[in-house]
């Protein structure tokens, strides 16, 4: 939720930090700050992954929530550029760096936790729930946006209303922290001798081809996922000329269907294998992405936009359901 709420509300808070630019430049600067968070994700994945190998999956998942909570709280309370000048975007960048560390570690650790908890026969089905929870976070962010759009004026949303979802995120993180403190450690970690509880970076370097293959699949999958989920709302507003409300609603409905598809594709991978799904994803992703985005840019009605987005998300499900 905390990671995605930034993108969902970017249309409203961008001028609070970059008010001296025009609307397009404000969004580009806001998107650049969003991208900065991604720079910290590999570091977060390495750092929290190493922490998880030494202290346990449960401890790493708890730490990732603390980092995310701190980032959300900073964004919720930081004064705008008009009050503290350049320090406003500086604090925003710092908050996103913390959230990038959190998300980078969260993905790998949560995937490890679920795969270690799963049985071999249902590993794909179980691992698919990583993206179910991710999409639930996106849906919650869009749900908060829809409620605020219905109950507040654009003036209030642009002025101060955009802070509400970040404050909500900080509170939800506290709840998540309490829940994670009560989860069980995985059996795989508990039976591992203390002398062997260390990272495996040196082992990865012994398999460069496999490492590069995984990096390529992850880069392509992540780019596609964020394009057709996180970025789609802004694409429909800025490129297709949709209203903010229509763009938000079609994004929410398509994400709901996308979430339901994850266990189905996870179960299919248990039956037919992961490799065929990855081949379908890579082939259709390369051939279909540009035509879909080109058609979406001129889509004028809700149903056309929805079915085009869903076509892309069905292809994405071949990857997301098993990427953990």
Residue ranges and their predicted role:
Residues 102, 124-149, 172:
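Glycine-rich segments within core transmembrane alpha-helices of 12-TM secondary carriers
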Residues 6-7, 208-258:
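Extracytoplasmic gate region of multi-pass secondary transporters
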Residues 31-50, 67-71, 252-265:
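Central cavity-lining transmembrane alpha-helices of secondary-active solute carriers
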Residues 78, 84-104, 303-322:
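Hydrophobic core of transmembrane alpha-helices in multi-pass small-molecule transporters
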Residues 10-43, 90:
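Extracellular/periplasmic helix-loop-helix junction of adjacent transmembrane segments
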